[in-house]
Swiss-Prot record:
Its job: This enzyme is an effector of chloramphenicol resistance in bacteria.
Organism the protein comes from: Vibrio anguillarum (Listonella anguillarum)
GO BP terms, alphabetized: response to antibiotic
Designated gene of the protein: cat
Keyword Transferase: yes
InterPro entries noted in UniProt: CAT-like_dom_sf, Chloramphenicol_AcTrfase_AS, Cmp_AcTrfase
Protein's recorded name: Chloramphenicol acetyltransferase
NCBIfam families named in the record: chloram_CatA (NF000491)
Stored PANTHER family: CHLORAMPHENICOL ACETYLTRANSFERASE (PTHR38474:SF2), SLR0299 PROTEIN (PTHR38474)
Species lineage: Bacteria, Pseudomonadati, Pseudomonadota, Gammaproteobacteria, Vibrionales
């Protein structure tokens, strides 16, 4: 994994970054419905399929891989991996597990299953310890669907990485849908970039229809 520093003097986005990071700090969230019919009617497991799809599109675009390091320098990770929530039924609290991103869907799912088997019973916020710096957060709230969702972060104006939150899927008119909230920083990500992400994410989900696995 490489962390490439951004040269602010020559960066084409310098004016926008300065405006939305310093002058008028601004984050925003967008909630959309994704068609997951191909996943639900196929044999793919839902959660790893969604994690793979989100990670694939995150790794396509630099604006979703930018952060500020410990020295206050802005840079871009060469690759990101998901750090996602799992629910602990006995404590009614969640834990986080991270899984290495692998471009091959089948291999990614195998790594997901391996992590779940090894760390899924661990308690605490980090069921799988020592998360790398190049992880991004994904949450699943499977108990209800929603049409709007946003996070209120006290220090969110300094956080550049995207945050993804899925809700409960539902069936409507013969199709399966799931809500997804995407929270981003306007300093690095405009509406165009978020909409492109959503459109590409839907395409990746559609492409998973021919992949097998145990249904979840």
């Amino acid at each position: 994994m490489e962390f490439r520093l951004v040269d602010l003097k020559t960066w084409k986005r310098k004016e926008y970054f300065t405006h939305y990071f310093e002058s008028v700090p601004c984050t925003y969230s967008m909630t959309v419905k994704l068609d997951i019919t191909t996943i639900k009617t196929g044999k793919a497991k839902l959660y790893p399929a969604l994690l793979y799809a989100v990670s694939t599109v995150v790794n396509r675009h630099e604006e979703f891989r930018m952060t500020v390091d410990d020295e206050g320098q802005i840079g871009i990770f060469s690759e990101m991996m998901p750090c996602y929530t799992i629910f602990q039924k006995d404590t009614e609290m969640f834990s986080n597990i991270w899984t290495e991103y692998i471009g091959d869907y089948t291999e990614f799912c195998k790594q997901y299953e391996k992590d779940m088997q090894q760390y899924g019973e661990n308690k605490g916020m980090m069921a799988k310890p020592n998360p790398p710096v190049n992880t991004f957060p994904v949450s699943m709230i499977p108990w209800t669907t929603f049409e709007g969702f946003n996070l209120n972060l006290q220090k969110g104006y300094g956080y550049l990485l995207p945050i993804f939150t899925f809700g409960r899927y539902y069936e409507e008119n013969g199709k399966y849908w799931i809500p997804l909230s995407i929270q981003v920083h306007h300093a690095v990500c405009d509406g165009f970039h978020t909409c492109r992400f959503i459109n590409e994410l839907q395409d990746v989900i559609q492409s998973l229809q021919n992949h097998g696995g145990d249904e979840e």
